[in-house]
Design a protein with these regions (language model features):
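Short alpha-helical donor nucleotide-sugar binding micro-motif in glycosyltransferases
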Residues: 17, 177, 184-189, 271
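Donor nucleotide-sugar binding/catalytic pocket of nucleotide-sugar-dependent glycosyltransferases
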Residues: 72-118
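Acidic anion/phosphate-binding donor-loop and adjacent secondary structure
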Residues: 111-126, 162-163
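Conserved donor-binding/catalytic core segment of Leloir-type glycosyltransferases
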Residues: 120-155
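Nucleotide-activated donor-binding/catalytic signature segment of Leloir-type glycosyltransferases, i.e.
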Residues: 162-180
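Aromatic "clamp/platform" in nucleotide-sugar-dependent glycosyltransferases that forms part
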Residues: 197
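Short hydrophobic beta-strand element within catalytic cores of glycosyltransferases
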Residues: 214-217
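A charged, aromatic-enriched C-terminal amphipathic alpha-helix characteristic of glycosyltransferases
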Residues: 238, 249-277
């Protein structure tokens, strides 16, 4: 039954590819659809590109205990047959190259400057903020349990939301927000705290910068590609609270200025330049 379904997917995808008369093939997911697209391209000797958005092996290990080598091996099988694989940051690119991934190119991220911008009046800046998925793999508990004189607000949902809300009643969990309402949370925060150890970029980081809010986090892939010590935030190898205390001293004007390199025009240019013609 499963083989029959896979065959139908492959045949349907083949028809769509042939009818599209496309110039380029980019496969953005590693799941069943991505594997099907990869199979078609290899069978027909069509060059294609892929991308890696997250540290998926680390996520799988944190949640299910599956060894890193197993998942990394599967990802290398999927991506190393591509002409190019797009990655978010230089540090993640270096890590992947050390793990045996090949033909990696940089593909950054941007933000909507019509929504994310500093508060003209300077803002309230009275709390510490986390925005993102409320889940164990985000290491959010490092933020929740951290001693702080400032209140803490968590924006976002996820599988650990209810349990963390019960465990940390002093933290204000406000749920999922978007658009101007989300931007207002950024603007009114004294510091944006990003405790994750497994993100490859973190769009929330540049959204915070665009609102003039300095970042505190750990010195790991993702944050260390974006945060400039004393300019737009602070990172620490072990102590999140120390990073927060330093970030609170950072000028919000220089923080905002550092966001200006993250434009969607640059992102689009990087993507277009990475594509490989199918014919």
């Amino acid at each position: 039954m499963q083989e029959s379904i896979q065959m139908l997917i492959l045949l349907d995808l083949k028809k769509k590819i042939e009818k599209s008369n496309a110039d380029f093939m980019h496969i953005s997911v590693e799941g069943p659809l991505g594997v099907t697209g990869r199979h078609y391209c290899l069978e027909h000797e069509i060059p294609y590109t892929t991308c890696i958005h997250t540290k998926f092996p680390e996520y799988v290990y944190e949640r299910f205990g599956i060894g890193l080598d197993v998942t990394k091996g599967l990802l290398k099988w999927f991506h190393n047959s591509a002409a190019k694989t797009l990655v978010n940051t230089e540090s993640h690119k270096a890590e992947l190259e050390d793990d045996g991934f090949t033909d990696l190119v940089l593909w950054s991220r941007g933000f909507d400057e019509k929504i994310f911008y500093p508060c003209p009046e300077g803002g309230k800046q009275k709390y510490l903020l986390y925005v993102g998925r409320v889940a164990v793999e985000k290491n959010i508990e490092e933020f929740l349990k951290m001693p702080s004189e400032l209140p803490k607000i968590v924006v976002g949902g996820g599988p650990s939301l209810k349990s963390y809300a019960r465990k940390y009643p002093d933290v204000d969990f406000v749920g999922f927000k978007k658009g101007k309402e989300l931007a207002d949370y950024y603007r009114d925060a004294a510091c944006f705290v990003f405790p994750s150890l497994t993100d490859t970029f973190g769009i929330v980081l540049i959204e915070a910068l665009a609102c003039g809010t300095p970042i505190a986090g750990f010195n790991v892939t993702g944050p260390k590609d974006i945060v400039i010590e004393g300019v737009n935030g602070s990172l620490d190898d072990k102590n999140l609270r120390d990073a927060v205390n330093r970030a609170l001293q950072v000028d919000r004007a220089t923080t905002f200025d550092s966001s200006k390199t993250y434009t969607w025009d640059t992102v689009a240019e990087q993507f277009i330049n990475s594509l490989v013609p199918m014919k």
